[in-house]
């Protein structure tokens, strides 16, 4: 290992350091997210291949046991770590009102587009959405909150350090870090870990000249009195300390001091690991820190120590550092890699990231956010929040608007930003009753947001073919509605069958239909396409247990899906499955007046 710093830190501007920290965190997040066990990756690609090739597309299982479905994550896309860094950064643009904007706007809105969010942060954000302080909620919620000691705080506080990069004192930054942290986490492990990490990032932003080997760890250890105190938050959230005492008695400050001692012990282990020089001891040190221990690996203190260690260890070879973090299988890889990337970027700027700096999701937007924070004159000290507190009704209105929208439609997102619908994703369901759809929205500022809706499919809605589905088609409508001309290129009826072998024999041998095409999962006989009920299990059902999966679907291939969609909407026919893209085809499904499913398809390449 090369222990010399290969970068001349004197030549790196503060803006470049800020952009490097933001992008380094995002790149580490995107590299590490597929590797963490909690991501529930199901495509089982080879990790070594990914490590050498950089970003790759992957598939995760989402929805838990009740709404299971698969979700495709595109190469370079980031998770909640980067989302929450950006939430913090946007809040800081509101000057002294940043904390109120964070709890009233950013956290409640985040509940609608979060990807991979941690339990404590999601619970707290839902409480803010309901207008409740997590530390003032019902007893059960309050206890959960004060037991939350994970890394969800440390992962998002880097913007505070960048905004205060030229400050000569860490005190105000420390206060803001804890004020940010208590919005979601109440245990000292979350807050002390965030303070130690924040101090390391602050040191990295301020560092110029030659960086000594292991210097960052040494500074965090030697300056413990500058970052380890529990700040007074009375002027920000006056009820917090009272709740902390109510739940923990007078012991909260004792727990805090024990946690500081724990943090120092972890950092001492890191310092010891640095003494091994060129020897490859990363796995050994990360193991000693607890990074692979299921019960503590997500702790704020453990993650802070791991990221400070890896950033110190690889200061001379920074990209190797986030790869080491991102592919430490069994650890909380996305957060460790993101936090490691934040420190390394604060030291070395952007250059070390290579093409990853351009290929990570929303790269230009991320750079712009760092640039905005660096231009302090653009911050309005008492800027009024863009809108009042976000409530559930705001988010419900957003969903209603999305369900009515078409690709390309523009409207205001819940946080006041203008967004455009850029894609509609129909997720692969892993159960017969789960329907999962996501809208990809692109904000005018450049951020990509995925908003998902999960629902239950009601078989009775389709199975009752004897009941006409209500469509607003009066005699006048039929006679006078002007509809666009539809050019049909092909047509078939899709039959879901219980036994492919028997059905093929019947249609091919008994009825004489020629098999024109076939694959592992379907057989096309003329204009009839046979599809198995369950291509994996090939389950068989009695006639008494038929479900909606047994219905036939009329498939019509057209030149322009948009024309047909417009006609269907104009006459008020029901859209059963919204427009989605799969394997080069665009398609949606509507219902005819008698409840028959009609799938409209357009080949797009």
Locate predicted features:
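Short acidic/glycine-enriched loop/turn segments that link adjacent beta-strands
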Residues: 519, 550, 582-586
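N-terminal beta-strand motif that seeds the catalytic metal site of vicinal oxygen chelate
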Residues: 480-502, 552-554, 604-605
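Structured, active/binding-site neighborhoods that engage oxygen-rich ligands
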Residues: 1-481
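Short secondary-structure junctions
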Residues: 423-427, 512-518, 574-579
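Short amphipathic alpha-helices within nucleic acid-binding modules
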Residues: 503-506, 562-567
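Vicinal oxygen chelate
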Residues: 481-486, 565-605
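Conserved short beta-strand elements that form part of the metal-binding/catalytic scaffold
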Residues: 514-548, 597-603
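Amphipathic alpha-helical segments
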Residues: 499-514
């Amino acid at each position: 290992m090369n222990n010399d710093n290969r970068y001349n830190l004197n030549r790196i501007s503060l803006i470049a350091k800020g952009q490097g920290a933001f992008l380094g965190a995002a790149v580490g997040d995107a590299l590490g997210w597929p590797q963490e066990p909690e991501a529930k990756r199901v495509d089982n690609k080879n990790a070594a291949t990914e490590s050498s090739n950089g970003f790759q597309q992957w598939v995760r299982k989402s929805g838990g046991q009740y709404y299971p479905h698969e979700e495709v994550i595109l190469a370079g896309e980031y998770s909640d770590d980067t989302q929450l860094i950006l939430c913090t950064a946007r809040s800081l643009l509101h000057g002294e009102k940043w904390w109120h904007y964070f709890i009233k706007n950013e956290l409640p809105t985040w509940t609608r587009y979060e990807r991979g969010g941690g339990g404590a942060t999601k619970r707290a954000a839902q409480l803010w959405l309901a207008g409740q302080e997590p530390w003032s909620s019902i007893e059960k919620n309050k206890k959960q909150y004060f037991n939350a000691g994970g890394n969800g705080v440390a992962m998002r506080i880097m913007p505070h350090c960048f905004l205060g990069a030229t400050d000569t004192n860490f005190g105000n930054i420390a206060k803001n870090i804890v004020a940010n942290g208590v919005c979601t986490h109440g245990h000292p492990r979350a807050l002390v870990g965030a303070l130690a990490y924040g101090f390391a990032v602050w040191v990295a932003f301020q560092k110029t000249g030659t960086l000594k080997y292991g210097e960052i760890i040494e500074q965090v250890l030697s300056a413990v009195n500058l970052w380890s105190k529990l700040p007074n938050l009375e002027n920000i959230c006056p009820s917090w300390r009272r709740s902390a005492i109510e739940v923990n008695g007078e012991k909260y400050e004792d727990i805090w001091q024990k946690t500081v001692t724990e943090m120092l012990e972890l950092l001492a282990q890191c310092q010891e690991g640095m003494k091994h020089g060129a020897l490859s001891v990363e796995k050994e040190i990360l193991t000693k820190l607890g990074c692979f221990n299921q019960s503590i690996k997500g702790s704020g203190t453990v993650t802070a120590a791991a990221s400070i260690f890896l950033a110190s260890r690889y200061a001379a070879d920074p990209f190797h550092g986030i790869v080491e973090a991102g592919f430490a299988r069994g650890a909380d890889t996305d957060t460790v890699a993101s936090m490691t990337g934040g420190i390394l970027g604060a030291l070395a700027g952007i250059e070390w990231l290579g093409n990853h700096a351009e290929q990570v999701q929303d790269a230009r937007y991320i750079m712009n956010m760092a640039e905005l924070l660096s231009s302090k004159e653009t911050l309005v000290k008492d800027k009024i929040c863009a809108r009042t507190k976000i409530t559930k009704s705001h988010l419900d209105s957003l969903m209603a608007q999305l369900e009515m929208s078409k690709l390309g439609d523009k409207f205001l997102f819940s946080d006041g930003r203008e967004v455009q619908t850029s894609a509609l994703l129909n997720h692969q369901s892993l159960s017969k009753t789960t329907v999962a759809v996501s809208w990809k929205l692109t904000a005018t500022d450049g951020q990509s947001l995925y908003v998902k809706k999960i629902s239950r499919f009601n078989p009775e809605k389709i199975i009752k073919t004897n009941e006409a589905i209500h469509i607003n088609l009066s005699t006048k409508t039929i006679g006078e509605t002007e509809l666009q001309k539809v050019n049909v290129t092909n047509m078939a009826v899709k039959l879901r069958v219980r036994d492919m072998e028997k059905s093929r024999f019947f249609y091919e041998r008994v009825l004489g239909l020629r098999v024109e095409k076939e694959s592992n999962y379907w057989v096309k006989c003329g204009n009839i396409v046979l599809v198995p009920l369950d291509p994996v299990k090939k389950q068989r059902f009695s006639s008494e247990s038929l479900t909606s999966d047994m219905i036939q679907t009329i498939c019509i291939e057209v030149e322009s899906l948009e024309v047909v969609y417009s006609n269907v909407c104009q006459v008020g026919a029901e859209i059963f499955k919204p427009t989605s893209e799969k394997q080069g085809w665009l398609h949606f499904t509507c219902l005819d007046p008698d409840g028959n499913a009609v799938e409209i398809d357009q080949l797009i390449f």
